[in-house]
Curated annotation (Swiss-Prot):
InterPro entries per the UniProt record, alphabetical: FAD-bd (IPR002938), FAD/NAD-bd_sf (IPR036188), Kynurenine_monooxygenase (IPR027545)
Domain of life: Bacteria
Family from the record: Belongs to the aromatic-ring hydroxylase family. KMO subfamily.
Protein's name in the database: Kynurenine 3-monooxygenase
Entry keywords, A to Z: FAD, Flavoprotein, Monooxygenase, NADP, Oxidoreductase, Pyridine nucleotide biosynthesis
Molecular function terms from GO: FAD binding; kynurenine 3-monooxygenase activity
Catalytic activity from the UniProt record: L-kynurenine + NADPH + O2 + H(+) = 3-hydroxy-L-kynurenine + NADP(+) + H2O
Keyword NADP: yes
SUPFAM superfamilies: FAD/NAD(P)-binding domain
Pathway: Cofactor biosynthesis; NAD(+) biosynthesis; quinolinate from L-kynurenine: step 1/3
Record EC number: 1.14.13.9
Cofactor: FAD
GO biological process, one term: NAD biosynthetic process
Length: 455
C-alpha cells in the first residue's frame, strides 16, 4: 500500500484531459499519480477504430498554452479553413469557418496528441501507471484497488482524493454511483459511427484538399474527413442504426462498398481499404451524458467526458474538457480545501457544459441536413454581412464557440437571438439585395450587446 502525500491527487485515466490536468497541477506543486486501464501507447500502439479525429479550437489552445504544451502539439496539427461540402452532383464548395486564416481550426490525431501530453506529464513530475483498471473504491477509507488485466493481479493504494478523467464509460463514475447516486442519464442518438482512413498519395501528400474538413451530407446520414499531418485523412461515416441505409443494412465490407458507390462515389476511390477497415473497426456509439452532480465532497470529482460526454459534432468535446482542466486548477489555487474547490468548479462549469452539449446536437442537424440548403446558405451570407457591419455585436455562433473563449452558455443564448434575426430577415428573399439595412441595424443594436473579445 502506498502512503498518501500532502497536496496529492490520484487521477483515473491517462487520456487527453487526464494528461493535461496532470501537467497543470504537477507544475503547481501537486504530487500527481495517474492510473490508466490500457497499456502505454508509446510502446504498444494506439487503440484503433474508437476515436473520431479531433478539432483543436482556441479554447483548447489556450489550455495548452497554460500548460506549456502548445508548441509541441501544434507541430502535429493541420489547419482547416472551413467545411468542404461534397454534393452528390456537382463540385465541392468551401464554406469558410471565419473571415480569414486567423480564424481556423486545427485537426490533430488523438494518438499523436495523447502521446505528446503523456511525455509532458511525466516530464512535469506526474507518475503514470499503465494496465491499472479501477476495480474497487472505499471512499470513506481512502482505499482503491486496481486490476492488471494481463495477469489479474490486484494493486492497492491509499488516496487523498480521486479525479475521474476516464471518459464516457468512467469506472470512477460507476464507483461514485455505488456510493451515492449521481443522477446519471445518457441519451444515445439513433446513429452510430464507423471510422476509416484515406491514405496519402504514393509520393506523400493529401489526395484531396488538405486544409479543410470535408463533408458529404446526405440528409439522414453523412461522411466526414479530417486531415492528419502525415497526409492521411481520418474519415468517419455517421449512419442510422436502423432503416435504409443503416448499420443494420450495411453489415459487411461488400455492403459498405455498395453504399459508397451509390451515395459517396467521389470518396470511394480515396479509400482503398474500405472493405477491410469496415470489418475491422466496430461501430461507435454517440450519446450525451448528464449528471445531477459531479463530485463527492472532497473525495472524488469527474471532469471532461466522465462528467458531461457529448456528441462530437461541434468538435468541442476535447476543447471543453481542456477548459475543465484549467478551471479546476484555478479553483484548487483559490480554495484551501478540496470540497470547496470541487463544488466551485462544478458551479462554474455546469451551465457551460450543458450549453455545448445542446449546441453539439444542433450542429449535427446543421452538418447533416443544412450545409447544402439554399435557405441556410442565404442566412450564412447575411450572417457574414452583419458581422462585417457590426463586428462586436453580431458575432457568428461558430466564432464565439471556436475562435473566442466566450462562455458556452452565453454563446448559446446569443446564438438563439441571432438565429431569430437571420430567419426573420431572410424570410421570402432569395438574395440580400432588398433587405432593410436600417431596420436590421436597429434590431441588432436593440437585441445584442457588444461581446467581450469580439473585434
Amino acid at each position: 500500500m502506498n502512503p498518501v502525500s500532502p497536496r496529492s491527487l490520484t487521477m483515473i485515466g491517462a487520456g487527453l484531459a487526464g494528461c493535461l490536468l496532470a501537467i497543470l497541477l504537477s507544475r503547481r506543486g501537486w504530487q500527481i499519480t495517474v492510473y490508466e486501464r490500457r497499456g502505454d501507447p508509446r510502446i504498444k500502439g494506439y487503440e484503433c477504430g474508437r476515436s473520431i479525429n479531433l478539432a483543436l479550437a482556441e479554447r483548447g489552445r489556450h489550455a495548452l498554452r497554460q500548460a506549456g504544451a502548445e508548441e509541441v502539439v501544434m507541430a502535429k496539427a493541420v489547419m482547416m479553413r472551413g467545411r468542404m461540402v461534397h454534393p452528390l452532383v456537382g463540385e465541392p464548395q468551401l464554406q469558410r469557418y471565419g473571415r480569414d486564416d486567423s480564424e481556423v481550426i486545427w485537426s490533430i490525431h488523438r494518438a499523436a496528441l495523447n502521446v505528446a501530453l503523456l511525455d509532458l506529464a511525466e516530464q512535469a513530475g506526474a507518475r503514470v501507471h499503465f494496465y491499472r483498471r479501477l476495480h474497487t473504491v472505499d471512499f470513506d477509507a481512502g482505499y482503491a484497488r486496481f486490476i492488471d488485466d494481463r495477469d489479474d493481479q490486484p494493486h492497492e493504494i491509499h488516496f487523498q482524493s480521486l479525479i475521474g478523467s476516464d471518459g464516457a464509460g468512467s469506472a470512477l463514475r460507476a464507483a461514485m454511483q455505488r456510493k451515492s447516486p449521481l443522477g446519471e442519464r445518457t441519451e444515445f442518438l439513433d446513429h452510430s459511427y464507423k471510422e476509416l482512413e484515406i491514405p496519402p498519395l504514393p509520393g506523400g501528400g493529401f489526395r484531396i484538399e488538405g486544409n479543410a474538413l470535408h463533408i458529404w451530407p446526405r440528409g439522414r446520414y453523412m461522411f466526414i474527413a479530417l486531415p492528419n499531418d502525415g497526409g492521411t485523412f481520418t474519415v468517419t461515416l455517421f449512419l442510422p442504426n436502423a432503416g435504409e441505409p443503416s448499420f443494420a443494412t450495411t453489415r459487411n465490407g461488400d455492403e459498405a462498398f455498395a453504399l459508397f458507390a451509390r451515395d459517396f462515389p467521389d470518396a470511394l476511390p480515396l479509400i482503398p481499404q474500405l472493405k477491410q477497415h469496415w470489418e475491422e473497426h466496430p461501430p461507435g456509439l454517440l450519446g450525451t451524458l448528464t449528471l445531477d452532480r459531479w463530485h463527492l465532497d472532497g473525495r472524488a470529482l469527474l471532469i471532461g467526458d466522465a462528467a458531461h460526454a457529448m456528441v462530437p459534432f461541434h468538435g468541442q468535446g476535447m476543447n471543453c474538457a481542456f477548459e475543465d482542466c484549467v478551471a479546476l486548477a484555478d479553483q484548487l489555487d483559490a480554495h484551501d480545501d478540496l470540497a470547496s474547490a470541487f463544488a466551485a468548479f462544478e458551479a462554474a462549469r455546469r451551465d457551460d457544459a450543458g450549453a455545448i452539449q445542446q449546441m453539439a446536437l444542433e450542429n449535427y442537424l446543421e452538418m447533416r441536413d443544412r450545409v447544402d440548403d439554399p435557405e441556410f446558405l442565404l442566412q450564412r451570407q447575411l450572417e457574414q454581412q452583419l458581422q462585417a457591419r457590426w463586428p462586436t455585436r453580431f458575432v457568428p455562433h461558430y466564432t464565439m464557440v471556436t475562435f473566442l473563449r466566450t462562455r458556452y452558455s452565453i454563446a448559446l443564448a446569443r446564438s438563439e437571438i441571432q438565429r431569430e434575426i437571420l430567419v426573420e430577415a431572410t424570410r421570402g428573399h432569395s438574395d440580400l439585395s432588398r433587405l432593410d439595412w436600417a431596420a436590421l441595424e436597429t434590431i441588432v443594436h436593440a437585441r445584442l450587446e457588444p461581446l467581450d473579445g469580439a473585434h
